[in-house]
């Protein structure tokens, strides 16, 4: 089983929002590493900074949360393999052509699902209802 996650799940896990209890509960019951991409890594760290800039989280917390995230990467709870961006973009283009006109999917959401498929993920973690539909249509199991 390969589990991949999008930024909404990771922000809830490492940041602090209304879904944080759900992310922590899922994480406590899971022993498998979660696979992410450099795109997800970038988007999460930027989202943490954005949240601090907008005062959604306290001053200095974006750095603290990013350290927690990077610690989990270093300790293997998260895995960030090298991925071929060309492969991800090709799969994202395919998913967009197949689903965006009927599902109104955003670009980065499509990239995360495409990357999960390229990494041969079986499961996908997201708190974004629209992205959940895309992931399920792409054959991924979305357990939360």
Regions found by a protein language model. Name each.
Residues 5-6, 105-107, 128, 140-144:
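Histidine- and aromatic-rich ligand-binding microenvironments
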Residues 17, 72, 95-99:
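A short secondary-structure junction motif
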Residues 77-129:
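Active-site neighborhoods of divalent-metal-dependent phosphate/nucleic-acid chemistry enzymes
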């Amino acid at each position: 089983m390969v589990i991949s996650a999008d930024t909404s799940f990771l922000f809830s896990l490492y940041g602090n929002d209304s879904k944080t209890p759900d992310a922590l509960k899922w994480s406590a019951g899971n022993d498998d590493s979660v696979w992410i991409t450099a795109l997800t890594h970038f988007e999460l760290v930027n989202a943490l900074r954005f949240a601090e800039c907008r005062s959604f989280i306290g001053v200095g917390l974006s750095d603290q949360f990013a350290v927690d995230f990077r610690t989990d990467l270093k300790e293997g709870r998260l895995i960030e393999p090298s991925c071929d961006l060309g492969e991800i973009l090709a799969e994202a283009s395919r998913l967009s052509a197949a689903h965006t006109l009927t599902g109104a999917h955003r670009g980065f959401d499509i990239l995360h699902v495409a990357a999960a498929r390229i990494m041969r993920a079986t499961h996908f973690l997201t708190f974004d209802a629209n992205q959940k539909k895309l992931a399920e249509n792409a054959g991924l199991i979305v357990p939360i």
